[in-house]
Amino acid sequence: MSTRWYPIYQRGNPQLRVFLPNFWMKLIRPTEEQPPNVVTFSVSMEMTKYDVRNYLEKIYKLPVVDVRTRIAMGETKKDQTYGYITKKDDVKLAYVTLPREESFVFPDFFSEKAEKQAKEEKSLDESKAGFRRFLDRNKKRPGTPGWFSI
């Protein structure tokens, strides 16, 4: 249930008002391998399973079969200098199961960047291999410069 109040009725037409709850949902990549019809959301702590289901069905028109929620404990960390312990906020995760016919795949926005990075890694590996061949050639004469070869 939202904590915001629905606007008061006012006489006359049109009734221009929109009720926006203070709920939020964030689509996240799952940490473990999941079936293609299961989608993981990070939701606000106040949301229940029924709120998640209604949110997706009414606003986004998604057919929802099942909703499971859990509260993931925030990460604790010890400060290296002073030794005090800090803890990140807990997060509520919702696992939404869609019908078997539907599947969700994260879009690959950075495929061009991955190709470019692979190309750069290939050229770096080639230069490393060339340098290694140079070192192997001069193994028997340590300390001599490269121009001093036969």
UniProtKB/Swiss-Prot annotation:
One of its GO terms (cellular component) is mitochondrial large ribosomal subunit. It is found in: Mitochondrion. The keyword Mitochondrion applies. One of its GO terms (molecular function) is structural constituent of ribosome. Pfam families: Ribosomal_L23. Its main location: mitochondrion. Belongs to the universal ribosomal protein uL23 family. Component of the mitochondrial ribosome large subunit (39S) which comprises a 16S rRNA and about 50 distinct proteins. This is Large ribosomal subunit protein uL23m.
